[in-house]
Amino acid sequence: MSEKLQKVLARAGHGSRREIESIIEAGRVSVDGKIAKLGDRVEVTPGLKIRIDGHLISVRESAEQICRVLAYYKPEGELCTRNDPEGRPTVFDRLPKLRGARWIAVGRLDVNTCGLLLFTTDGELANRLMHPSREVEREYAVRVFGQVDDAKLRDLSRGVQLEDGPAAFKTIKFSGGEGINQWYNVTLTEGRNREVRRLWEAVGVQVSRLIRVRYGDIPLPKGLPRGGWTELDLAQTNYLRELVELPPETSSKVAVEKDRRRMKANQIRRAVKRHSQVSGGRRSGGRNNNG
């Protein structure tokens, strides 16, 4: 069964459909040696050869590809990019290796923000979850420094003007602290760059700590170490798919046996420890990555 080329490439994680359409229009995609045109359809078969900028890429039939989703505890100091020219650690460094697929980040967190970051092998799922029209809730725990009064909280709820347009928190809830150091839990339904920090700064308050604790109804897993990941089970994966009107999966690669879960947890802890040691050695090796 043939499918639109941009749909096949989006599913394989090579960008959103709109991004891929631009790549196709620029003549950067070829199918079996011929430059592709927007609107082309392909049938995914073992002999199909699709190249982007001359590089052969791997694609699979929709029925063959199992949608996988990871919940990752991003530490502060990691970049949301696949490769950094300065050799700084990235969120992809510790993820499990894949064959015939790749992990796609669902949105981004800035370098000084930690917490929940979802990854998936399904490009269409990632793009829909990120799109503002879906209004998927993101919840953050925020420690702020500065005087917070009722007027400022009203402004943050009703909306303030940022350089890229108006913005507001959907909910704001005080969660502890005294004096000018206080914690709040806030929610947004979009993911603009540094939006949480910029909203608080717009009312004269600085953010000193920022942790994403929930994406949709998926919380940051309890007990997950910083730099650790866990794979969502079938029910959680299908919750996310239903949330953005994608058909459910019927199978999962998550092991259900307790012994295998325990083994995986131990492997994650060892990977976190090993990566921390490597990162520490990299930073002390004479290259200054703090600039």
Swiss-Prot record:
Domain (S4 RNA-binding): give its ranges: 3-75
A cellular component term (GO) from this record? cytosol
PROSITE patterns given in the database record: PSI_RSU, S4
Q: Where is the active site?
A: D110
Q: What is the effect of changing D110 to N/T?
A: Loss of activity
Q: Name one GO molecular function term.
A: 23S rRNA pseudouridine(2605) synthase activity
Question: What does the record give as EC number?
Answer: 5.4.99.22
Q: Which parts of this chain are annotated as the region Disordered?
A: 256-291
Q: Fetch the SUPFAM superfamilies from UniProt.
A: Alpha-L RNA-binding motif, Pseudouridine synthase
Q: Which NCBIfam families match?
A: PRK10700.1, pseudouridine synthase
> What is the protein named?
Ribosomal large subunit pseudouridine synthase B
Species of origin reads Escherichia coli (strain K12)
Point out the gene that encodes the protein.
rluB
